[in-house]
Amino acid sequence: MNINDFMFTLINELNENLFYEVELYKECNKYDKTYLLRVIAKRHNKKYDYGFSIHENWLDSISINEIINFLLMQ
């Protein structure tokens, strides 16, 4: 999946009020898992940690596809 497909999927899954922030993210032209987790948390009006600890090891172990799948399941 390329960045355009990924961002299209993400935009379709997000609330409209996050569209501007996602557009800013697209400008970065990179994958940033921490950013994606913040977006997911905001989407659900939760705290940043979304009920789990964010550690570098955990971020390294999760794939972009897993994050997309998480979004699609919501």
Annotate each PLM feature.
Residues 1-26:
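Negatively charged, low-complexity tracts enriched in Asp/Glu with abundant Ser/Thr
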Residues 6-13, 36, 40, 66-70:
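Charge-rich, solvent-exposed alpha-helical interaction surfaces
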Residues 19-63:
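Acidic, low-complexity, intrinsically disordered interaction modules
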Residues 58-74:
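Mixed-charge, Lys/Arg-enriched low-complexity segments
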